[in-house]
Amino acid sequence: MLFSWREDPGAQCLLLSLLLLAASEVGSGQLHYSVSEEAKHGTFVGRIAQDLGLELAELVPRLFRVASKRHGDLLEVNLQNGILFVNSRIDREELCGRSAECSIHLEVIVDRPLQVFHVEVEVKDINDNAPVFPMAVKNLFISESRQPGSRFSLEGASDADIGTNSLLTYSLDSTEYFTLDVKRNDEEIKSLGLVLKKNLNREDTPKHYLLITAIDGGKPELTGTTQLKITVLDVNDNAPAFERTIYKVRLLENAPNGTLVVTVNATDLDEGVNKDIAYSFNTDMSADILSKFHLDPVNGQISVKGNIDFEESKSYEIQVEATDKGNPPMSDHCTVLLEIVDINDNVPELVIQSLSLPVLEDSPLSTVIALISVSDRDSGVNGQVTCSLTPHVPFKLVSTFKNYYSLVLDSPLDRESVSAYELVVTARDGGSPSLWATASVSVEVADVNDNAPAFSQSEYTVFVKENNPPGCHIFTVSARDADAQENALVSYSLVERRVGERALSSYVSVHAESGKVYALQPLDHEELELLQFQVSARDAGVPPLGSNVTLQVFVLDENDNAPALLMPRVGGIGGAVSELVPRSVGAGHVVAKVRAVDADSGYNAWLSYELQPGTGGARIPFRVGLYTGEISTTRALDEVDAPRHRLLVLVKDHGEPSLTATATVLVSLVESGQAPKASSQASAGATGPEAALVDVNVYLIVAICAVSSLLVLTLLLYTALRCSAPPTEGDCGPGKPTLVCSSAVGSWSYSQQRQQRVCSGEGLPKTDLMAFSPSLPPCPISRDREEKQDVDVDLSAKPRQPNPDWRYSASLRAGMHSSVHLEEAGILRAGPGGPDQQWPTVSSATPEPEAGEVSPPVGAGVNSNSWTFKYGPGNPKQSGPGELPDKFIIPGSPAIISIRQEPTNSQIDKSDFITFGKKEETKKKKKKKKGNKTQEKKEKGNSTTDNSDQ
């Protein structure tokens, strides 16, 4: 900053005060500097960076910049040394006019973090303007009759400077007739007048030329001059006189045209023409006043004829002259001081500078979004402006300085709820009525990855038919991410795990983009009934977010397995079964039983038996049970019947379409006396190869006993641990519930293999009897221990190890070699609700204590893992391993599972095919003396119980 009065002690004190004031203002956010007008380019103003507490090295990185509402190029900051200097010519008179205070307001903005500083630079006046008179030559007419002491008003000079630089003094050339008179009134208005010192004599000197000099109070002094050309007139010796020298008037701005301002009045003591007065504006009046006001020359009324704006000019000084019509004319002057009263006619102005757009939705609170400055050209209360913001938005306005606001974040943002805000900033002044202005700010919320992909369900259930083609589309998963752009791009993948011995990815795959799930290979219901796995959805954000969904794929059964016949090991030719039947049997005698199994489930495994008609349409005396497979006689046999019958039994399931198998049974009709011999020969022929296997059977028995002993020890240890351990959550593994699902067909199963397949965990399954109700949903059941006890049969209900007396007898082995061990497949009962399919699980033996057998269950989904045993002759009647009660009802299913107890006198044998053993031959020898009738009755009775030797 330049000072020409550096040596002055008072100036040094003033400078020190200014520096202390500037230092104190740094803490409050505003600095004060001063600079003289007309300073040269590069003139030092202040060390702004140092005063603001900023390091020079951070000016450029923090984007140090200076902003100003007006005259932004007058001052500039050197970013290398942080000095504020003069950039262009500063003219105080052009910048502030005749205002007593003149300052340049600057805004200094730095980023990272955003800070705003306010700097006020005071522009000091220098004496650079000389006094100026309105006219270079002033013509003045003075009558020679004017008396000494008469005063003639003159227009004084004006100086554009202020303060002492504008204080003017006047001087007049030396003359004996005139002197200058300068008066100062209460309004600090200097009245310049020319006073006549002695009488004029027009005849001596008709004209006088005077030079008036105006000198200002600056250093150095500047002067201005004007020349007075005085013409001496004769006659009219009374000039008009105004009632008041000064008129003070107040006028509202924006007054309409024609509004009366004031009426001036002057009187003249002369008479006649010399008394007539005409009013006019002084010839020195500015063009601006002449354009805004009108003066009636006759009545002296001043009225408005232009726009009166307080913001343009707060007051007007109007010079009015009254001139009579004498010769020469005489005049008088008065001054009208017009004060303009401000009204609230200017709306506030808003300037918004956006700094941080768009705004991240995770931005911290109090983040500065934009800077807002307001102004109002009105004064007083009319110029006091307050700002407000649209309600119910997560932003607020914070006043940082007078008429300056910051738009800051007030509450957390969520782009998924609102992606953009249209804010309206309202600036309202304090006038009555108040005026306001609005400005819109569009705030866009930028997305961050704060939402994970979400599935519409936590679990999906899918039904797929088995034998699907490889690559078959079975389902489509879809997850939605509430984020935008890359944060919403979802990719899908499998959550890999093991399914038995194979990886999950060998069964199914999922398309990464579409979420389509494909079966990579044909699924087999008999191998896998339920495939449970998880699909993961993950977005492309940083860091990525994800979620999982569970898919339960139920493999529905198709009729893809034909019935399989359980054929005997010996007897028959080319796979056919041979049976010998005495001709003496009556109607209903069971000749043989055909047994078959189907690997499918439900109706696809429900088997029925049909006897194909004989060749040539001949009627045969045999029939087959529709659901039992038992071949029995339809009538008593006689001599006319052919000795050999080839029976074709068609076994078919109830699938769509049904699959079939054919069993061939060769029935030979023999006389009653020949049947025991044939049976004996067959038994003798079977013992030959059986003897060759004795050694092998010994090893097998030893191995079976060892394995059984190990199994018993394991079960005992497991039972002891389970009784002492706390209850677990489920049977399929820790934390994994047993999955109980209802099938569309069938309502129960008894299968160790099936129980293992529906478990999604890796734990060992139990061999339980599980009853399924169609009302059960196809989803995992509760892990509650009480509910599990209602579904699973307790381990204590498992069958015990077979009694050591349960062994294969020689007759039983012979019977097994000579016949097909089959079991009834079911009994169709007609009830009130229609026929019910009964799936027997274990068949009871004859009620006698010395005979009994258990055959493998045949029905829906039952495999051929079955066994047969015989009660020892000395044991009482008891339930064998795996036998069920006579009848039990499965809740929710119409099926009634029963074990059919045959009557004592029933002729239906439980052996697969009827043979005549040695026991009948022995009885006939002992009763040789009896009649043929008694012998025939014995033969019939022995035929029904002969399976005890088998």
UniProtKB/Swiss-Prot annotation:
Positions glycosylated per UniProt: 257, 265, 548
Region spans: 6 X 4 AA repeats of P-X-X-P: 734-894
Main location as per UniProt: membrane
Molecular-function annotations in GO: calcium ion binding
Membrane topology: Single-pass type I membrane protein
Localization annotation: Cell membrane
Protein function: Potential calcium-dependent cell-adhesion protein. May be involved in the establishment and maintenance of specific neuronal connections in the brain.
Protein name, entry field: Protocadherin alpha-3
Organism, scientific name: Homo sapiens
